[in-house]
Amino acid sequence: MSDTAERVKKIVVEHLGVDADKVTEQASFIDDLGADSLDTVELVMAFEEEFGVEIPDDAAETILTVGDAVKYIEKATA
């Protein structure tokens, strides 16, 4: 797992209070990890702060899984 993936995983575990074993790249924030719409907004804000990137609303709507977040952040920080 990349450094970015590890950092994303840590944020998800802290914000959603889920077991780290459940946070896989395929895990859906809503369907698998129990996030609601407010949780997803807070996660996006936490990702922006942690990685120093801006995630516009239209992009945030496409980030549905942990893997989506990792890919977006890695592309934005490349």
Curated annotation (Swiss-Prot):
Q: Which GO terms describe its molecular function?
A: acyl binding; acyl carrier activity; phosphopantetheine binding
Could you tell me which residues carry O-(pantetheine 4'-phosphoryl)serine? S37
**Could you tell me which SMART domains the record lists for this protein?**
PKS_PP
Its PTM note reads: 4'-phosphopantetheine is transferred from CoA to a specific serine of apo-ACP by AcpS. This modification is essential for activity because fatty acids are bound in thioester linkage to the sulfhydryl of the prosthetic group.
This protein's UniProt keywords: Cytoplasm, Fatty acid biosynthesis, Fatty acid metabolism, Lipid biosynthesis, Lipid metabolism, Phosphopantetheine, Phosphoprotein
The record's principal subcellular location, in a coarse class, is cytoplasm
What is one process in the GO biological process aspect for this record?
lipid A biosynthetic process
InterPro entries, A to Z: ACP, ACP-like_sf, PKS_PP-bd, PP-bd_ACP, Ppantetheine_attach_site
Q: Which PROSITE patterns match?
A: CARRIER, PHOSPHOPANTETHEINE
Its Gene Ontology cellular component terms are:
cytosol; membrane
Q: In which pathway does it act?
A: Lipid metabolism; fatty acid biosynthesis
| Keyword Lipid biosynthesis included in the entry's annotation | yes
The chain positions of domain Carrier read 2-77
**Protein family per UniProt:** Belongs to the acyl carrier protein (ACP) family.
Its annotated function is as follows:
Carrier of the growing fatty acid chain in fatty acid biosynthesis.
Query: What is this protein's name?
Result: Acyl carrier protein
What organism is this sequence from?
A: Chelativorans sp. (strain BNC1)
